[in-house]
Amino acid sequence: MIKGYLNRPEATAESITDGWLHTGDVARIDEDGFIFIVDRVKDMVLRGGENIYCAEVESVVFKLDGVAECSVFGVEDDRLGEEVGIAIFPAAGTTLTADSIRAHCGNHMAKFKIPRYIWLMSEALPRNASGKFLKRELRELLDVNDAA
């Protein structure tokens, strides 16, 4: 497939082991043997031993009226390892609150998956050239003390 990353020996060592490329994808196999890509390992929050897939939380939040963009990521926590954090860019003319977001999530997912930290952003979330959210930049930009 590939020999490695150009001029990035650390990245090569992390992703290729004994000739096998570890893509970082998380998948499930259904009862018929079909494989479904669920998320990426990097896009999973490990909260107190529970795996929380960012894509699952994002899909629930996107169903809430007034959400233009959202991105879920892990926030370091001394007790649980990570907590769920979400940055939301509301649609123009809408009024979202942390309480309304948590209430919506509580009706559609397990309690431990509900975001503890919620940031309502005044600008669109940062993206790369292919349109993916830059979660690392979001983490650096946001302060847990400013979350709702």
Q: PLM features: residue spans?
A:
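AMP-binding/adenylate-forming catalytic core of the ANL superfamily
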Residues: 3-4, 11-17, 26-113, 124, ...
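General small-molecule cofactor/ligand-binding pocket signal
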Residues: 118-121
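Catalytic cores of nucleic-acid endonucleases
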Residues: 127
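Conserved phosphate-binding loops in nucleotide/dinucleotide-binding enzymes
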Residues: 134
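Acidic/polar alpha-helix N-cap and adjacent early helical turns
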Residues: 140-148
